[in-house]
């Protein structure tokens, strides 16, 4: 089983565009508001050096065991959002 986690925040137009693009691509994802999931997001920032949203954590799971994790922090532009969607599709 694979899992897509999207880190986002309220009032972020890029986050809204990314959510819409994921929905249009029929990609299931867990939306993590960085204000509610601060500890989790802080670990993401520490691992990537990226403090901007939207950002992804992609995980391959076998049962409860994480077999692979990819971190993805696309630039905030229209083309990169769609490129990020393609990377997510290819990972899944």
Segments and roles (model prediction):
Residues 33-52, 62, 85-91:
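Thioredoxin-like thiol-disulfide oxidoreductase module
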Residues 10, 32, 44, 69:
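Conserved short-loop catalytic and cofactor-binding motifs
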Residues 54-58:
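Cytosolic beta-strand hydrophobic patch enriched in CBS
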Residues 45-53, 69-76:
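Thiol/disulfide oxidoreductase modules built on the thioredoxin-like
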Residues 1-30:
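Local sequence-structure signature of Cys/Sec-based thiol-disulfide redox active-site neighborhoods
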Residues 60-92:
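Non-catalytic, surface beta->alpha helical segment in thiol-disulfide oxidoreductase systems
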Residues 11, 34-37, 74-77:
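Short beta->alpha junction loops/turns
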């Amino acid at each position: 089983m694979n899992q897509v986690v999207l880190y986002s925040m309220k009032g972020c137009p890029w986050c809204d565009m990314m959510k819409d693009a994921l929905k249009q691509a029929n990609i299931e994802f867990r939306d993590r508001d960085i204000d509610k999931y601060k500890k989790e997001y802080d670990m993401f920032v520490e691992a990537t050096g990226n403090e901007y949203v939207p950002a992804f954590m992609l995980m391959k799971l076998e049962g409860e065991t994480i077999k692979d994790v990819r971190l993805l922090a696309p630039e905030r532009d229209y083309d990169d959002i769609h490129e990020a969607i393609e990377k997510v599709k290819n990972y899944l």
